[in-house]
Structure formats: C-alpha cells, structure tokens
From Swiss-Prot:
Its main location: endoplasmic reticulum. This is Protein SEY1. Residues 1-684, 730-786 are cytoplasmic. The chain crosses the membrane at residues 685-705, 709-729.
Length: 786
C-alpha cells in the first residue's frame, strides 16, 4: 500500500467532478482489496474556521491550510479528497486501523463567493449523500447563532435532503459530529449539546416536508454527536489531547460513528461511480436515490449471475435447438433450457441477495428467455405453416382422390388444422405458451387465404375449360352452319349455342336449380363465375359471327349457294342446258336463293322474324356507371341498346350493297360463260369433215403405222407421257428442262469465249513482224485500238 498523502480535488470550484478518482484510489491502496471496509468522512463549516487544520491533525492528511499571520482568506476551493490510514489517537501505533477517505469541503460564508450560496448548498448536500460521518466545525461562541453556525444553510440542505430521500424506505443515516472549537468548558458541553439539538429539532419542524414525510423527525435521518476541542493557540496541549481523544472515537470499533446503517455498503470502485452520479444529479437538480449496500450489491451480483446464466442458456440453445426438431422435441428442449437457466443457474445463487432485487432481476431474465423462446416458437410455427400449406396444396390437387373439389379442400383443411394443433400443443402443455389461440387464428387466416386462392384458381380453370370448349366444340359447328346457310340459319346456330351452354352448366346445377361449381366458394363467387361463363359464351358467339361474316366471306357463301343451285340439280348432278331459256330459269332461281341467304345473314333473327339480342345483364360495362348516372341514365341505356343491336345487325345496308355488286359481277360472268357454251355446242364441226380427212390422209396413216421405228418411238413417248401425267411430274419435268436449257446456254457461252481468247495470240503474232521492220512507224489505228 502506498504512503501517498497528497489530496486530489474531487470537485473543483467550477463544479466539475474529477474523472481520475478511481486511479487515485488505486495509487493509494495498490493491490489491497478493501471491499466495503473503508469509511468516508467529510467536514463542513465556515470559511477559515480551521477545518483543514483539524483534518490534517486528526487523519494525518496534507490539506492546504491558511497562514493566519499572512492573510485570512479562502484556502480550500471546491471539495478535496485524501486517503488516510493513520489516526492521531492515544492508542498503540501498530493497531489495526481501517482506511479512511476524508473530504475537505469548501467553507461557507466566504467573501470570495459572496451571496452566491449555490455551491455551498450543493457541496453540503453532496457531503451528506456520500459520507458516513459529517463533521460540523463551529466555534463555541457560534452556538445559539443562526447564520453564524450555518443553521440557515443546514436548513436548506436538510429540506432538499428530505425532499429527495424522505420517501426512501431504506433511509441513509448520517452521523453528525459537531466539533465545538475553542471549547472553554465554562458552558458545559451537555448544555451546548441540548441547545444545538433543540435548534435542530425546531429547524426540522419548520421544514417544508413533502407528502408522506409529515411525521418524520430529525433523528430519523441524523444521529447527532458532540465533541469539544481546546484552543489551538492558547491551549496547545489541551488541543492536542482533545484531538487524541477524538481520534480514539474513530479508532474504537465500538464507537457509534461507524454503525452499519451509516455505510453506503458499496465497493470502493462503486463508491466512486456513486459519488459522481450523486454530484451529477445534485448539480442537475435531479431526484437522487441512495440505495443501500444490500440493494447495490444485490443488483450488481444478480446482474452478474443472470448474465452468466443467460450466456450459458445461449450456448446450450445454439447447440441443441435445430430446425429438424418436431414440435414435441423442440418444446421439451426449450423447457429444459429454461428450467436449467432459472432453477439451476440463477435461483440458487441470486436468491441469497435482497429478495426484491432478486425477484426483479429474475423477472427480467425470464423476459429475456421468453423473447428467445417466443422467437423460436414463431420460427417453428412459420416453418410448420409453410410445410402444412405445401401439403395442403398437394392434398387439394390430388387427382387420385375422387369427389368434388369442395370435399378435397375441406378434407385437406381439416388435416392441416389438426396437424398444426398437434405440433403446437406441447408448447402449451409445458407452459411455454400462455395461449395457442393467436397462433391458431393466424394459421387459420393464412389457410383461409390459400383456400380462397385455390377456389379462385379452380373457378378460373372452369372458365378456361369452358372457353376451350367453345373453341373446340362450338366454333366449327357454327362456322359450318354459316358456310352453308339456310333461311333459318340463326335458329340452327342458336340451337347449337344454347345446347352447348345448357349442357356445360347442367353438371353444376343443384336440385334447387342454382349453379354450384362445387369449389366451396361463396354464392356470390358462384354467381359471378356463372355470369362470366355466359358473358364469355355470348362474346365468343359475337366475335365468331362478326369475324366470319365479312364482306368477302359473304360473297363467297353466296357464290357457293348460287353455283350449287345454278350448275347442279336437286340430285347433285351437273346440269346440261339445251337452250338459253333453261339457263335463264336456273340463273333466276339461283340468284334469288343467294340473295335470300344474304338477307338471312344480315340480321340475327329467328324464324318468327324477331331479332336475337345479347341479354342485357351480360353486356360489359365500360366503367362504374357513375358518368351515366349524372346524365339520368340515358347514355347508359343508349350504350346498352347499341351493344345489343351490334350483335344482331351483322351487315349494314352499305355492306349489303357492296356484297350485291361483287356478287352481280360474278353471276354476270357465269351466265355469259353458260350461254357461250351453248353456242359452241350448236356450232361444232360437221361429221363428214372427219370422214374426208381420214380418206385423204389414209396413205400417210398407213405409212406411219407400217414403220417399226415410228411405232416404237410412239409407244415410248406415249408411255412416258402417261407415267409423267399419272405421277404428276409435269412441274418437275418442266423445271428440269429449264435448268438443262440454262446449263446448255452457259456451256455454249463459255465455248464461244474460249474461241475468242485462243484467237488473240494469233493476231499478235501477225502484228509483231511489221513492228520489227519499222519501229519508228506510228501504230495503226487498229493497233492503237488494241
């Protein structure tokens, strides 16, 4: 242990706390572990009343003191701290003395601060908060005075102290040691003591007490003690002996100065932090709580024990909790970890400390554990929910299961809910969950969402299959009826359309005649789907009819009808006209029937001449109807009528005129061709001309027939022509001939080009002799050209 006696300024005159206090303790004590075996003593009194001198004499400290022979002025500024292990007493030098930490507080009523008493009050309150013994240094002649013995300052300090600590059940008591300086003994110490106690009690009764502290007394917070010291200058020996006697009171372990209720019960490092916090709260006028040593130690130790237990819990948790555990296994592991942490690692060690603190920290630890447990259960529920949802989808779509989709969903839903509750039950049984209702409700909401999604998908699939059936089963039939129309073509079309629509909905019609698609969906969803099917069917019919019956297609249909009636009889045999009258009759009949087909196709109506309209309820709306309502509904009515008439009115009058014009052009050509064929037939070559040709050319015919080469060549040519015609090879043969002709032409051009190139050297040879004979001759025009 160091013999360091120099003091440090704990709080400077600018009210700043010294952050190196703990280092000072380390320098003073070295490696010594004092624990709570130390005492804090402070001194309070007027400026220049000899406080520092008394402390230096009594505790062997080195506080600065005033040189009265030079000037009386402020010496101690702020609050100073010094360590002492020596007490000036009459006892043996080697007796065991605890460690003392002495606070020298700046004197009150100094000229330097004047009327500024803020620091005086805060310093006095700080000394009361952190000290076991507060030495009140006063002169004997100040007893009975109010300002002279700092009673005004004490009243203010006591009042603030009461407002801060009065409601604390574990009140921190302080021993007030009134040291009466220059005590002459003329007035007995007991009389002075009685006067001071009376003043203190009277002052206490006049305090403004907070609610709940009305019945408190001065002695509930303070234990007054009194001691007289002789005059230091005029009674040096008496003063010395009195200081020794006072020191004996501090050394005597049985003295009343060091009762357990005075001590803060904090380790020394804890006292440093505690003192700093006290000063910060006093400086900032915050409520100050001075817990007892048991509370502080309990908090410190229970925090330490809880932290160790929690860390062990985390280590065990990371090694034992995995995603592969099922509900029962996971619940067992979590319950074991929780019980071990609380019952084994925390309770046996922490229960030895203050019950209230132990229970509070236990609750905090349980909350920490529950946070992890709840998070683990939530993750488990999330994984379980995802797995069950996936299984639910598989079961709902299992094609091996017979029955309506509604029964499949219901069965899959019951199975998923049952499995979920089974997996969650162990957590409730082991009290890891207070209630499963929240998780079950959340799971059911998730499953219901999936059910609604599957139902919607199934309804969409029904609509898709219906739309596909329209294309596969109905479209070709309608197009066939339109391609070969009759006068009652629309009755036939609507018969097929109604038959398909009713047949598609019949299997979904229940006994009450209402549509139920057996998906478990609501009535509104079924009605909406039924409406969609019917609307799609009519929309399909609309697009099919209007898409096929274009102007060109209608002209083709009329041509076919005209040709069938004009060129063929009722038995389907081709007609052979003998005269123009027959042609004209067939023409008029065929044209009339073709035009009647045009009239039938132009407007969708039944045999009773009533237009067939799309049901008004199935007409698609262009908006929410709000725009129509502003106009009294008139525009909406007109729009609906337009869509209905658009379906039934296939061809407009203008389109019919165009179609008739194109059709007339076709029929005019047909009748002209027919009449021309009659003329050609009646003006054929006479038969005697054929006989004359044979008679005159008989010799040539015999010559050809008698020539074997001609016969063989004719047979080969005729056979080749027959096979080419039979195999339909005239096209490839013609293409081959064209290619052969092209290649022959290319070869011929190449041959001519080669001949020209070969002729060129010969011409050069003929020219060179002439050039050698006359080099200076001008070249001829042919040479220049070459």
């Amino acid at each position: 242990m160091s013999d360091l006696k120099e003091a440090i300024q704990l709080i400077d005159e600018n009210k700043q706390f010294n952050p190196s206090t703990l280092n000072y303790f380390t320098k003073c004590l070295g490696d010594k572990n004092v624990g709570v075996k130390y005492h804090v003593i402070s001194v309070f009194g007027s400026q220049s009343s000899g406080k520092s001198t008394l402390l230096n004499k009594l505790f062997d400290t080195k506080f600065d003191t005033m040189d009265a022979q030079v000037k009386r002025q402020q010496t101690t500024r702020g609050i100073w701290l010094s360590h002492s292990a020596n007490i000036y007493s009459s006892g043996a030098a080697n007796q065991s003395i605890p460690d003392f930490f002495v606070l020298d507080v700046e004197g009150s009523d100094g000229a330097e601060r004047g009327e500024d008493q803020d620091f005086e009050r805060k310093a006095a309150l700080f000394a009361l908060s952190v000290s076991e013994v507060l030495i009140v240094n006063m002169w004997e002649n100040q007893v009975g005075l109010y300002q002279g013995n700092n009673m005004g300052l004490l009243k203010t300090v006591f009042e603030v102290n009461l407002s801060l600590f009065g409601k604390n059940e574990n009140r921190h008591k302080v021993a007030l040691l009134f040291v009466i300086r220059d005590f002459t003994g003329q007035t007995p110490l007991e009389s002075l003591e009685a006067s001071l106690v009376l003043e203190l009690e009277k002052m206490w009764s006049q305090l403004s007490k907070p609610e709940g502290c009305e019945d408190t007394s001065f002695h509930d917070f303070f234990v007054p003690n009194f001691f007289g010291l002789g005059h230091k200058v005029f009674q040096p020996e008496q003063f010395d002996n009195d200081v020794k006697s006072l020191g004996d009171l501090f050394v005597d372990q049985d003295a009343s100065f060091f009762k357990d209720e005075y001590h803060t019960h904090l380790p020394l490092d804890g006292w440093s932090l505690y003192a700093e916090n006290c000063w910060e709260q006093i400086e900032n006028n915050k409520d100050l709580d001075l817990p007892t040593q048991q509370i502080l130690v309990a908090r410190f130790k229970t925090d330490e024990i809880a932290a160790a237990a929690y860390n062990k819990f985390l280590n065990d948790y990371q090694s034992q909790v995995t995603d592969s555990l099922d509900g029962k296994e996971l619940a067992t592991v979590l319950k074991t970890l929780q019980s071990t942490c609380i019952d084994v690692d925390y309770d046996p060690f922490a229960s030895r400390y203050a019950k209230k603190v132990y229970e509070e920290r236990r609750d905090d630890l349980i909350k920490q554990l529950n946070t992890i447990i709840d998070e683990t259960i939530t993750n488990f529920v999330t994984r379980t929910t995802s797995s069950l949802i996936e299984t639910f989808h598989k079961n709902a779509r299992d094609r091996s299961l017979k029955g309506p989709f509604k029964l499949k969903i219901q069965s899959a839903l019951e199975k998923a809910s049952r499995t979920f509750k089974t997996n969650l039950a162990p957590f409730s049984e082991l009290e890891l969950l207070s209630s499963m209702d929240a998780y079950i409700s959340k799971f059911e909401a998730r499953v219901n969402t999936e059910v609604a999604d599957l139902q919607e998908r199934e309804l969409n699939a029904i609509v898709a299959r219906f739309n596909k059936g329209l294309t596969i089963k109905l479209k070709d039939t309608i197009l066939h009826l339109l391609a070969k129309p009759t006068i009652n073509v629309w009755d036939d079309v609507m018969k097929e359309f109604t038959s398909f629509l009713d047949g598609s909905l019949k299997k979904y019609t229940n006994e009450d005649g209402k549509i139920d698609f057996q998906t478990g969906a609501t009535t509104d969803a079924n009605d909406k789907t039924e409406h969609t099917l019917k609307r799609n069917a009519w929309s399909f019919l609309d697009h099919t009819v209007h898409g096929y019956l274009t102007e060109d297609n209608v002209v083709d249909i009329m041509r076919n009808v005209f040709n069938d009636k004009f060129r063929y009889d009722d038995d389907g045999m081709p007609k052979f006209w003998k005269n123009e009258a027959e042609v004209d009759a067939s023409y008029r009949l065929a044209k009339s029937q073709a035009l009647s087909v045009l009239d039938a196709l132009a407007i969708v109506k039944n045999k009773d001449n009533v237009e067939i309209l799309i049901p008004e309820a199935l007409l698609e709306s262009d908006g929410d109807g709000s725009d129509y309502e502003e106009n009294g509904g008139q525009e909406e009515e007109e729009a609906g009528l337009y869509h209905q008439q658009r379906f039934s009115h296939v061809l407009s009058a203008l389109q019919k005129d165009k179609i008739i014009t194109k059709f007339k052009q076709f029929t005019d050509l047909v009748i002209i061709e027919a009449k021309r064929s009659i003329v050609n037939t009646t003006e054929r070559i006479p038969l005697y001309m054929y006989a004359l040709v044979v008679a005159l050319g008989w010799g040539r015919i015999i010559t050809i027939l008698r020539n074997p080469a001609t016969i063989i060549l004719s047979i080969i040519v005729l056979a080749g022509a027959y096979f080419v015609h039979k195999l339909n090879l005239w096209g490839p043969l013609l293409q081959f001939a064209n290619q052969a002709t092209g290649q022959a032409t290319a070869v011929l051009k190449q041959t001519v080009r080669s001949l020209v190139v070969d002729e060129e050297p010969k011409r050069k040879i003929l020219v060179e002799p002439h050039e050698s004979e006359g080099v200076d001759k001008e070249p001829s025009k042919n040479d220049q050209h070459l």
